[in-house]
């Protein structure tokens, strides 16, 4: 068995005047390969510790949190990569509901604002709308986003303007539909982003690329949207 020390952000609005950091030592028996496994062990010791989790396999995005100063998924973070004390905090830039749980309302408001669905006014075919292999390949690196919010909550522009700046996750998905050969609303989507804040608050800091658990590149997608904006104004 190995003893590990966790420093966890704690805040219960029903009883705490302000947040605080709690230090907990726990014996791990070697079966806790991932951070989420260790968190489940911690919760068995102290049931009041609150965090989101679901699939355990990096698909749902529920257990995103700030791990030793960097956003990531607890279920994909190997305990062997975490040296010394493990500091866990909620995703930055969003209101804290309790402990490691944040209010995702603003994040999903911005995501929904880009109309994350195909817009095609032609008569629907009996089966699927076909794409060539080349057209389908254009969506690689775009559709895999799991909406964990690690990228947007690592972005200073989103911290400062969460009500105005769409954020890396939303803009990645905006380009996912702009790039889709089956979608017919490119002009409408670009019009929706024609604003000093919604798109152009991205200053290519690239924190989003650094933290994405799926290895996606929101900055590249945002750059392509900016390029399209420029080209249509020429």
Regions found by a protein language model. Give the residues of each.
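Short strand-turn-strand beta-turns centered on an Asx-Gly dipeptide
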Residues: 27, 66-70
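Short polar catalytic/cofactor-binding loops
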Residues: 8-14
């Amino acid at each position: 068995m190995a003893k590990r020390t966790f420093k966890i952000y704690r805040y219960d609005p029903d009883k705490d005047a302000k947040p605080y950091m709690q230090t907990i030592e726990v014996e791990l028996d070697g079966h806790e390969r991932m951070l989420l496994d260790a968190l489940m062990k911690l919760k068995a010791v102290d049931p009041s510790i609150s965090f989101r989790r679901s699939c355990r396999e990096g698909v749902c995005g529920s257990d995103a949190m700030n791990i030793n100063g960097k956003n990531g998924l607890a279920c994909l973070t190997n305990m062997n990569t975490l040296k010394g004390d493990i500091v866990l905090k909620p995703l930055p830039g969003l209101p804290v509901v309790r402990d490691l749980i944040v209010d995702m309302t603003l994040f999903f408001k911005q995501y929904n604002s880009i109309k994350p669905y195909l817009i095609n006014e032609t008569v629907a075919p009996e089966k699927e709308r076909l794409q060539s292999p080349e057209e389908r390949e254009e969506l690689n690196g775009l559709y895999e986003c799991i909406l964990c919010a690690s990228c947007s909550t690592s972005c200073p522009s989103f911290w400062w303007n969460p009500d105005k700046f769409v954020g890396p996750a939303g803009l990645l998905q905006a380009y996912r539909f702009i790039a889709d050969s089956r979608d017919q609303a490119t002009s409408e989507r670009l019009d929706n982003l024609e604003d000093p804040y919604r798109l152009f608050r991205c200053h290519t800091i690239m924190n989003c690329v650094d933290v994405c658990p799926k290895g996606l590149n929101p900055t590249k997608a945002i750059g392509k949207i900016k390029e399209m904006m420029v080209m249509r104004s020429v």
